[in-house]
């Protein structure tokens, strides 16, 4: 999506499940591409927890046949696979990693409401950064890449984007100013002495500026605490990474376990849909619509059953908020 290569990107780079997921035998497979700030968030989660993981590189633009098969049609980045379980969006990825590594530093350490608010805050900051990136690089992109980005972000008027838009720069400065103020409370990280989801969500956006938006770096450089924090986040690393091919993921799907499904409460408005064919899609961008059988739904998550390989079912976990369901006709 951005104007940097994968090598540069890589360099810069609620309950415990007992007896269900064995870290020694069930690999963490991240389907992603390095130049996405959302992939960088997931990679930093691995570094925060000191985890070993495998990377399957997905294409930057559609079609993405392997990940679309795995998810039932969703093609956003990143996607975390653990055996037969497939986790969509960094919100679900963070929860999954906290569950399988309960002894390590917690990502969602301060409660669901705060973590959800921080997730939404990061999404809001992404908008002016996205517009800055589109304005800076669209003239350099090949026609198929530009067409894909116009499809993914249909609400953006690509023809009116201004590289030096002062209002956009002011918005970025406002967001980063709140980070600087929080760091002024005297802790190494935004929530205290230990990095958590707050830092992860800010990291992806500040990484994007450092890596691909040099025109915005003068704004970052006016905030000294933010600069020091960025170095501390860099030092966390990205865990122990191994690059693998898609065949490894298919074998993990065949051999791996599936975690227990959550109960669907009787009070859940979508409870009558359980067992039916549904579609689910993100509301903020066109990342593809996933189709499958609704297995469970509650206030935190939606689980679909899909069949990436004939006779092999995957359980695909989506966040409940930010994604919209409809019954298939």
What is each model feature region?
Residues 242-272:
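Mixed-charge, Lys/Arg-rich low-complexity intrinsically disordered regions
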